[in-house]
Amino acid sequence: MMRKLAILSVSSFLFVEALFQEYQCYGSSSNTRVLNELNYDNAGTNLYNELEMNYYGKQENWYSLKKNSRSLGENDDGDNDNGNNNNGNNNNGDNGREGKDEDKRDGNNEDNEKLRKPKHKKLKQPGDGNPDPNANPNVDPNANPNVDPNANPNANPNANPNANPNANPNANPNANPNANPNANPNANPNANPNANPNANPNANPNANPNVDPNANPNANPNANPNANPNANPNANPNANPNANPNANPNANPNANPNANPNANPNANPNANPNANPNANPNANPNANPNANPNANPNANPNANPNANPNANPNANPNKNNQGNGQGHNMPNDPNRNVDENANANNAVKNNNNEEPSDKHIEQYLKKIQNSLSTEWSPCSVTCGNGIQVRIKPGSADKPKDQLDYENDIEKKICKMEKCSSVFNVVNSSIGLIMVLSFLFLN
């Protein structure tokens, strides 16, 4: 099957190629026949001549070239004809062909004459003997023959006939045309030639004739026109040139001239205006900010300065009022010493629960300064008495590095009950045992 298809395709290809070659040959022979008819037929020759005439008629330059070549050819033919006639060597066949050529040339010449453009005469300029018909008939016979050819044609007809014969020939060509007609004829001949061109035209006619010749030439052009006419003539020559331009105009005229130059710039602006003017200058700067505001105003001013600072805070407040009390509170109670010893031991035990010192508070504030907020901080200790701090709500917008220890920070005491180290060890052990047992059981 494949062999049959191959044979069929090859045979089809050969058949188509044979037809194509035959078509090519037929086309070539047909074109050759048409060209032969155009070249050798009389009608084709006439058509060629007409095309040639039309072509050269449109192209004038080529037409002239063709005409010249034909003229040369005609002259050559005439010379040859004369020579042949004189020699008697021309035959009838040649004469007949030459007669036909002459007819063709005559016909071509007539056509060429029709296509030739007529020549136009050029305009000629009038000679010296023909005067200008538009010339001025009233020319001045005495006119200056040396008139400036570049003179102004629009000269002023109203020029001054009595011009100054001694006028400055080098006058300023840029002079002011609107000069003052009432100018001073007796002007100062020694006037300053470099006067200020921008001088004030409305100068003060009553100006001071005794002006200081050493006045400052660089005076402030923006000086205050409303300056105080009653200014102090004896002003301080050493006044501060950097004085505050926004100084308080309502300042106290009776201010203390000996005020403290090192006063606290961060002083409380809301200080008590009714404060005691005779306050103790040596008061404790670290006083307890949480002191009882309702302290007894009748307290003993001569209290014992050596009192026990570690007294039992849980002591019975009514013990001294039970002069004839019952039980262990009786004045002659034999167990009284036992109770006092127990109280002393309790006082020793409570040493771990005493309130934190100011130093401890300051250290804690430095430690948590970046985390300070209006919320209470964690307790400063994990066992015993500590402190909690926060920023007062009114000072929440202040930068943390500008917070005042006394006025911007609020403090309170906190207590941590679980202080036994044994308890911590037991808790840790129980937790470890629970973790290990959980791991092993699983």
Swiss-Prot record:
Tell me which GO cellular component terms the UniProt record holds. Answer: cell surface; cytoplasm; plasma membrane; side of membrane
Positions with biased composition (Low complexity)? 81-94, 130-318, 340-354
InterPro entries assigned: Crcmsprzoite, Plasmodium_CSP_Invasion, TSP1_rpt, TSP1_rpt_sf
> Which Pfam family would be a valid example here?
TSP_1
Instruction: Identify where the record puts lipid attachment of type GPI-anchor amidated cysteine.
Output: 419
Q: Where is composition skewed (Basic and acidic residues) in this entry?
A: 95-115
Renumbered residue ranges of the record's region Required for the binding to heparan sulfate proteoglycans (HSPGs) on the surface of host hepatocytes: 114-121
Write down the Gene3D superfamilies for this protein, in alphabetical order: Thrombospondin type-1 (TSP1) repeat
Where is this chain glycosylated? 382
Top-level lineage group:
Eukaryota
Disulfide cysteine pairs (residue numbers): 379-414, 383-419
Where is this protein localized, as stated in its record? Cell membrane; Cytoplasm
Instruction: Note down the stretches annotated as region Region I.
Output: 122-126
Membrane topology, record value: Lipid-anchor; GPI-anchor
Q: Which residues form the propeptide?
A: 420-442
Tell me the protein family, please: Belongs to the plasmodium circumsporozoite protein family.
According to the UniProt entry, the note on domains is:
The N-terminus is involved in the initial binding to heparan sulfate proteoglycans (HSPGs) on the surface of host hepatocytes. The N-terminus masks the TSP type-1 (TSR) domain which maintains the sporozoites in a migratory state, enabling them to complete their journey to the salivary gland in the mosquito vector and then to the host liver. The unmasking of the TSP type-1 (TSR) domain when the sporozoite interacts with the host hepatocyte also protects sporozoites from host antibodies.
What is this protein called in UniProt? Circumsporozoite protein
Q: Which organism is it from?
A: Plasmodium falciparum (isolate Wellcome)
Q: What is the lineage of its organism?
A: Eukaryota, Sar, Alveolata, Apicomplexa, Aconoidasida
Q: Which gene encodes it?
A: CSP
